Design a protein with these regions (language model features):
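His/Asp/Glu-rich metal-coordinating catalytic cores
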Residues: 1-36, 41, 45, 50-227, ...
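A conditional alpha-helix N-cap/helix-loop micro-motif detector
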Residues: 41, 194-198, 280-281, 306-310, ...
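Short, basic, glycine/proline-bearing loop/turn elements
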Residues: 32-35, 187-188, 296-304, 365-370
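Generic long, charged, amphipathic alpha-helical segments
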Residues: 351-375
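Conserved beta-strand scaffold positions in the cores of enzyme catalytic domains, especially
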Residues: 108-110, 178, 328-330, 364-369
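Solvent-exposed alpha-helices and their adjacent loops that cap or buttress functional pockets
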Residues: 27-29, 168-171, 292-294, 320-321, ...
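Hard-cation-handling environments
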Residues: 201-342, 354-357
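Substrate-recognition/cap regions that form aromatic- and gly/pro-loop-enriched pockets
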Residues: 344-349
Length: 375
């Protein structure tokens, strides 16, 4: 047909300044009829207010949960970009303001999974959302144009996680498939199950806690934090893991509260279970920048997942990794250039650079990786 639909509008997670933006100049000469946001992660949503500035009347469709999560994440992105403007002298930051997010949100139109909707008021193109199983609110849109069907999976995951159920995609024939392949080159033990991996994690945590150590699990604030808290709760209920205090903070708290708002409104495991009321879950100090106290026997479930500089997990790690009784458990993706990857690749007793503006820290703790991919 003659409709032009934008699918996702992210920011490059490793680039800075304008290099982080998509090549918008390649599409700005033509109109856009609508946009689809498959899920809230910043590599899919991070530049949406920028493109909406060029197309202020363009409707943007997403799930209701993605609407809530993406708003919170974009507001946090403004804060991060503002800090980087001051620290790194990147004058283009922030790409948008808090006020602009509120303004462009008026063109956001949440839609329910499984319900076909028109992408434009003149008709000619429709879309149906299907559950993608990646994080809360993630969808795989199925487009229909002129009797042809196109499916974009977005980030997709087919196994049940602790909270989010596996993808629920249509079985009928489609004409074109646009498929993500994050793990396209990764093999996995055929005996692997998510629960067996959880039991391995619990065993290592028990060894650490029995030896009077503490555990740090660096986590992405949205998605991985909530899945991990639920998994630890499941392990405790199954008597695989002792009752401990789980500490979360900052953006992780905000995202967990949004997950709780949808606990009865989405297709998920543990319907209605409120994560903020899970036994042992504690909020870290409220004052900005204050680190939680390092106490024996605690489990520090802190962002960011890659131990990015200036984040709580990175700053606490500078004290944490010096204790040989402690354990750092990596449960998500670690970019090869990240502090988390440097820690994983180090040997006990080796110095690890966690912050480019500080001295390296000698790693004495245990470090182990576990596979809980959302792809």
């Amino acid at each position: 047909g003659d409709k032009r639909i934008l699918i996702d509008s992210g920011m490059h997670p490793k680039a800075e300044s304008k290099d982080a933006l998509p090549q918008f100049d390649r599409i700005l000469d033509e109109p856009l009829d609508a946009a689809i946001l498959s899920h809230a992660h910043l590599d899919h949503s991070g530049s949406l207010p920028v493109i909406q500035r060029h197309y202020p009347e363009m409707p943007v469709f997403m799930s209701e949960a993605t609407d809530a999560l993406a708003q919170a994440l974009l507001h946090n992105s403004v804060n991060v970009m503002t800090s980087k403007r001051e620290e790194l002298g990147i004058n283009e930051y922030p790409f948008f303001t808090h006020r602009e997010i509120h303004k462009v949100n008026r063109q956001w139109h949440p839609r329910r999974n499984g319900k076909k909707f028109e992408l434009h008021e003149t008709g000619g193109a429709s879309c149906t959302f299907y559950d993608a199983g990646h994080i809360m609110g993630a969808v795989s849109p199925l487009f229909e144009f002129s009797g042809k069907t196109i499916m974009y999976t977005g980030d997709v995951h087919f196994e049940d996680q602790s909270i989010i159920k596996g993808a629920n995609l249509p079985s009928e024939k489609i004409d074109v498939l646009i498929l993500e392949c994050t793990r396209g080159g990764a093999s996995r033990d055929p005996e692997y199950t998510r629960w067996s991996e959880a039991e391995k994690l619990a065993l290592r945590m028990e060894e650490c806690l029995e030896a009077r150590g503490s555990v740090m699990i660096p986590l992405f604030a949205m998605g991985r934090t909530q899945e991990t808290i639920m998994m630890l709760h499941e392990l405790q209920r199954a008597r695989k893991l002792r009752n401990s205090s789980f500490l979360i903070g900052g953006l992780s708290i905000k995202m967990t509260k949004i997950y709780d708002r949808f606990s009865n409104r989405i297709r998920r495991n543990h319907q209605g279970l409120n994560l903020m009321r899970v036994k042992g879950l504690l909020s870290t100090p409220r004052s900005r920048g204050e680190l939680p106290k390092l106490e024996q026997g605690n489990v520090y479930t802190l962002s960011s997942g890659m131990m990015t500089e200036k984040t709580m997990s990175n700053r606490l790690a500078q004290q944490f990794i010096a204790n040989p009784r402690n354990l750092v458990a990596c449960v998500g993706y670690a970019d090869p250039d990240s502090p988390m990857a440097r820690l994983i690749g180090s040997e006990r007793g080796e110095e690890v650079l966690l912050d480019s503006k500080k001295e390296p820290v000698k790693r004495q703790c245990s470090v182990q990786s576990f596979d809980f991919s959302g792809h």
